[in-house]
């Protein structure tokens, strides 16, 4: 009788929910935010496992398309060609980020250099070779600049940071638009002495270890850039003002363009108009397939993204301030929620 009772107790005990695994891969700029989100989310959702990988935005988009990851994290939205060929894939903004232009100038002092699109394009096309070249001097009157070769550093991987950086150059500099354009990968001009790096961590390391270098780095690495004593350039916007990325200048830039966001949410925020608009900002995307092969995976993916998008969940200052992102406007968050609900 006792044995029968024991067996009955075992049979009557409710089974624990099956574990569901989600895989995130892609943007190195967005990765620090996922690394803040995931432990807190999993603490309340122990039956879900989420893995992350820093592979670059281009790889993240491809992983979402191929189905090798449920979340392709990206600073770039899909191209028109990708969107036309993969109608099951949606681009879901999660936050607003920025890119910084950082440099390693020994004995430069604490005053940020001022740069504009044509000067940066000149550096990355090889037309401006020294730090004291006239186009840079003209933007920085009274600043002593070294007569030393500029060592430019760019991304080697398919990068959302490259996408936003080259969009800014494309929109602000006609000669760049005519010859190079923008994308997660572009046909970079060959410049003597140039270096390449993989990921934002790689860019930060390369600029920090290379005196007289310049590079572009995602703002989620701003604290590390400051610890490495890198300078951050003030960038000239459409109104002719030189600005650093702050919550105010990033939000101002987003407010100039976010009303143009289409239903599929693919929109560039680079080089926005407005006196107080920092010109190198972007939506941070989760690129996701709406057609998941397993209903349990689809539900876990929906639930996580709804939490990440919520002002009561992941879209709060606790998380966003730590990586120097700004939250989505309410109407963009509502549009993102509509896209998330399509996942099945």
Named regions from a protein language model:
Residues 17-344:
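Flexible loop/hinge segments at secondary-structure junctions
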Residues 1-10:
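Bacterial N-terminal signal peptides
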Residues 11-17:
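Sec/Tat signal peptide C-region and signal peptidase I cleavage site
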């Amino acid at each position: 009788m006792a044995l029968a009772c024991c067996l009955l107790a075992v049979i009557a005990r409710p089974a624990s929910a099956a574990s569901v695994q989600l895989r995130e891969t892609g943007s190195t700029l967005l990765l620090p935010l996922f690394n803040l989100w995931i432990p807190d989310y999993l603490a309340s959702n122990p039956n879900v496992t989420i893995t992350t990988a820093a592979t670059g935005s281009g790889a993240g988009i491809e992983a979402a398309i191929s189905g090798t990851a449920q979340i392709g994290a990206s600073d770039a939205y899909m191209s028109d060609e990708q969107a036309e060929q993969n109608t099951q894939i949606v681009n879901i903004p999660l936050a607003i980020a920025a890119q910084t232009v950082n440099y390693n100038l020994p004995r430069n002092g604490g005053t940020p250099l001022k740069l504009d699109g044509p000067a940066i394009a000149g550096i990355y096309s090889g037309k401006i070779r020294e730090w004291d070249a006239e186009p840079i001097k003209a933007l920085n009157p009274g600043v002593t600049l070294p007569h030393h070769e500029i060592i430019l550093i760019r991304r080697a991987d398919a990068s959302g940071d490259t996408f936003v950086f080259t969009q800014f150059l494309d929109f602000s500099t006609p000669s760049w638009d005519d010859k190079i354009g923008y994308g997660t990968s572009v046909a970079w001009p060959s410049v003597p002495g140039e270096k390449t790096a993989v990921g934002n961590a790689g860019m930060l390391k390369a600029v920090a270890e290379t005196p007289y270098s310049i590079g572009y780095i995602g703002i989620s690495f701003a604290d590390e850039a400051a610890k490495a004593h890198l300078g951050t350039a003030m960038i000239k916007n459409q109104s002719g003002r030189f600005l650093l990325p702050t919550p105010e200048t990033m939000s101002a830039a987003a407010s100039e363009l976010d009303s143009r966001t289409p239903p599929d949410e693919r929109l560039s925020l680079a080089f926005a108009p407005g006196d107080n608009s920092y010109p190198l900002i972007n939506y941070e995307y989760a690129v996701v397939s709406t057609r998941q092969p397993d209903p349990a995976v689809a539900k876990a993916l929906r639930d996580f993204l709804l939490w990440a998008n919520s002002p009561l969940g992941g879209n709060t200052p606790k998380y966003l301030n730590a990586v120097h992102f700004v939250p989505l406007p309410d109407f963009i968050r509502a549009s993102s929620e509509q896209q998330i609900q399509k996942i099945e």
